[in-house]
Swiss-Prot record:
SUPFAM superfamilies: Bacterial photosystem II reaction centre, L and M subunits. GO terms for biological process: photosynthetic electron transport in photosystem II. (7R,8Z)-bacteriochlorophyll b binds at residues 128, 148. The lineage of its organism: Bacteria, Pseudomonadati, Pseudomonadota, Alphaproteobacteria, Acetobacterales. InterPro entries: Photo_II_D1/D2_sf (IPR036854), Photo_RC_L (IPR005871), Photo_RC_L/M (IPR000484), Photo_RC_L/M_CS (IPR055265). Belongs to the reaction center PufL/M/PsbA/D family. Fe cation binds at residues 165, 205. It comes from Acidiphilium cryptum. This is Reaction center protein L chain. It is a multi-pass membrane protein.
């Protein structure tokens, strides 16, 4: 279509997107408000388990979830097609697949392991935020989840690493009046002087990709552990720390 490659998977992606969007609008029409902040498509009640629910009582959520997975999967496969046509690696669809994995973990894998679709999150702005808050408090302090710590660390490290790279590039190609534009060797020299090491212009992008994918994978893992594999408050998980032999020294 014009300059955009569509292909078979582009068509299937468009189908799932339009169907899912129409179902969200239908669900909003069944609800009490058209306030964009308050619209919510909730999953079935826990009493339905892993069964199919009536449309107005969670069935729409189930179909919308199928549409979302279909749209995301189609888009990833479309990216594979485009990558092959361009003769490049599959880095982009592989990276997007990690984001898809995180979504599927939240809406399919974790609810399956916990025995009810009602453990998925609702589709809505405020209702989604409420779900995040309630899920966190269900485990007393979610920040004590070790994989949550890893995920947050990787998210912030991704931002820091790519911000350092981006700011250096802007500084190199926008010199003060009277100075020449700097190139990669100047950038390498700057970081060798700054922190003693330069990963290089290609390496920083690979590092950014690695950190970002690690953050997505760790975030999926942290919620997957909560419920199916750990049902207590996360602070109590750290009890092993108090029993390390090192604390026995000094008579304590």
């Amino acid at each position: 279509v014009g300059p955009f490659y569509v292909g078979f998977f582009g068509v299937t992606a468009a189908f799932f997107i339009m169907l899912g969007t129409a179902l969200i609008i239908w669900g909003a029409a069944l609800g009490p408000t058209w306030n964009i902040w308050q619209i919510s498509i909730a999953p079935p009640d826990l009493s339905y388990g892993l069964g199919l629910a009536p449309l107005a009582k969670g069935g729409l959520w189930q179909i919308i979830t199928v549409c979302a997975i279909g749209a995301f999967g189609s888009w990833a496969l479309r990216e594979v097609e485009i990558s092959r046509k361009l003769g490049i690696g599959l880095h982009v669809p592989a990276a997007f697949s990690v984001a898809i994995f995180a979504y599927v973990t939240l809406e399919v894998i974790r609810p399956l392991l916990m025995g009810a679709w009602g453990n998925g999150f609702p589709y809505g702005i405020m209702s989604h935020l409420d779900w995040v808050s309630n899920t966190g408090y269900a485990y007393l302090n979610f920040e004590y989840n070790p994989m949550h710590m890893v995920a947050v660390t990787l998210f912030f490290t991704t931002t820091l690493a790519l911000a350092l790279h981006g700011s250096l590039v802007l500084a190199a190609i926008n010199p003060p009046a009277g100075e020449t534009v700097k190139f990669a060797e100047h950038e390498d020299t700057f970081f060798r002087d700054f922190i003693g090491y330069s990963i290089g212009t290609l390496g920083i992008h690979r590092l950014g990709l690695f950190l970002a994918l690690g953050a997505g994978f760790a975030s999926a893992t942290c919620i997957l552990l909560s419920g199916p594999f750990w049902t207590q408050g996360w602070p109590s998980w750290w009890g092993w720390w108090l029993h390390l032999p090192i604390w026995q020294f000094g008579g304590h």
